[in-house]
């Protein structure tokens, strides 16, 4: 005999009317096997809920109540648990999430998350002046997290996919120093009593196109002076670990980062000068990091130079150069030719540019740079080729001063 409610209406399987008059629907989630209940004030509302539950189960979605409460923050934690990435990279991702997402989008339930949420979020970040690359990084955390929710049967469709567009301020184009600027800067450093100790390191970064983390991570065992090769097999990174902020020995950024770079004469001479400097100034490495010792570029305390320290002395060098150039230009009654701001990456980018200007094969450039993606190298190569082509074409416009009259 069919069960009825207090109005005499037949109740379907799983439907119940409670003593307080409210309606309940009991069911078992087919994926998790858990029993669940939903409640409504009237039978019509309950049956609308039943339709949605049955549709979800037909689509192989999890209907378990606890899963429905899953927040975006918890989803991200699940996603991170699936990633086999370096500890430093994981910490960077979590730091980015905590700073921008945890207290904004993070508390929204995954099943309630809409495309409008993320578009509004990105738009607000754009209004704050965040860079395009920063917003792209946040998209790179949100999108795969929600993709995991789709794969796990929590939601039908990823609400984040396709939302990343032109949000954020465009990245400034990375400018390499011209050959003239490079030569002037190195000459200034060589003639400076204050900055001359930094000359070998700068020459190595220019000539070998190394990342700053690779440069400060070089040990004397990585440098084969006999065969004139640099063996790049790791890097030093500075970040917060279990013991606070300190250096960590790390693998190269990608497998392509492991490489043997032939030394140019400038680089070979730079290593010889650095060895002499270390002996003369007492800049001997006295630390062991990750089982490695004998670091080449050190502070007066015998520890490797921090990346921020490299950028700091580069900034000071440019400021000193520009101060001297401005004074000289004033004396010579001309406009000063100032050096643009530079960073450690400028030296690497400039070195890559010199390779391109000398028509080094793009595949060789990719190998020297340690790029896993050939497109990164080609972007630099094509920029150089395009600039050279434009200059060559425009040079055709240099007509003689006296142009023959057309008869």
Regions found by a protein language model. Give the residues of each.
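Short, polar N-cap/turn motifs at the start of nucleic acid-interacting alpha helices
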Residues: 222-229, 360-380
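N-terminal DNA-binding module of tyrosine recombinases/phage integrases
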Residues: 10, 17-116, 277-292
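C-terminal secondary-structure termini that scaffold catalytic or DNA-interacting sites
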Residues: 227, 238-240, 245-258, 265-267, ...
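C-terminal catalytic core of Y-nucleophile DNA break-rejoin enzymes
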Residues: 38, 42-43, 231, 240, ...
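Short, basic (Lys/Arg/His-rich) helix/loop patches that form interaction surfaces
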Residues: 12, 128, 187-198, 208, ...
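N-terminal core-binding DNA-recognition domain of tyrosine site-specific recombinases/integrases
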Residues: 29, 38, 42, 68, ...
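Catalytic-site neighborhood detector that most strongly recognizes the C-terminal catalytic loop/helix
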Residues: 168, 176, 236-238, 369-394
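DNA breakage-rejoining catalytic core of tyrosine-based enzymes
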Residues: 111, 155-157, 168-187, 233, ...
């Amino acid at each position: 005999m069919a069960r009825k409610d207090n109005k005499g209406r037949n109740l379907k399987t799983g439907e119940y009317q409670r003593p307080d008059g409210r309606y309940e629907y009991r069911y078992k989630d087919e994926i998790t096997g858990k029993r669940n209940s939903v409640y409504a004030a009237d039978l019509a509302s309950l049956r609308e809920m039943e339709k949605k539950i049955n549709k979800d189960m037909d689509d192989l979605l999890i209907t378990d109540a606890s899963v429905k409460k899953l927040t975006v923050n918890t989803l991200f934690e699940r996603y991170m648990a699936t990633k086999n990435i370096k500890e430093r990279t994981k910490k960077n991702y979590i730091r980015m999430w905590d700073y921008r997402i945890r207290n904004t989008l993070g508390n929204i339930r995954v099943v309630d998350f809409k495309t409008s949420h993320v578009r509004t979020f990105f738009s607000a970040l754009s209004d704050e002046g965040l860079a395009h690359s920063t917003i792209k990084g946040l998209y790179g955390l949100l999108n795969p997290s929600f993709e995991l929710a789709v794969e796990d049967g929590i939601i039908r469709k990823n609400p984040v996919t396709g939302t990343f567009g032109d949000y954020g301020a465009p990245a400034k184009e990375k400018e390499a120093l011209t050959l003239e600027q490079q030569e002037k800067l190195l000459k200034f450093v060589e003639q400076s009593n204050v900055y001359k100790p930094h000359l070998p390191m700068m020459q190595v970064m220019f000539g070998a196109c190394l990342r700053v983390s690779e440069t400060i991570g070089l040990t004397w065992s990585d440098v084969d002076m006999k065969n004139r090769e640099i063996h790049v097999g790791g890097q030093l990174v500075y970040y917060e670990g279990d013991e606070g902020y300190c250096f960590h020995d790390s693998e190269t950024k990608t497998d392509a980062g492991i490489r043997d770079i032939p030394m140019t004469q400038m680089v070979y001479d730079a290593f010889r000068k650095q060895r002499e400097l270390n002996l003369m100034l007492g800049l001997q490495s006295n630390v062991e990091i990750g089982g490695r010792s004998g670091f080449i570029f050190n502070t007066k305390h015998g520890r490797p130079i921090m990346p921020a320290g490299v950028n700091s002395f580069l900034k000071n060098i440019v400021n000193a150069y520009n101060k001297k150039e401005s004074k000289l230009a004033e004396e010579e009654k001309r406009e000063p030719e100032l050096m643009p701001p530079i960073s450690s990456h400028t030296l690497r980018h400039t070195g890559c540019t010199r390779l391109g200007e000398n028509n080094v094969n793009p595949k060789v450039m990719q190998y020297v740079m340690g790029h896993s993606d050939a497109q990164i190298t080609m972007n630099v190569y094509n920029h150089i080729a395009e600039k050279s082509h434009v200059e060559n074409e425009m040079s055709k416009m240099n007509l003689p001063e006296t142009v023959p009259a057309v008869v």
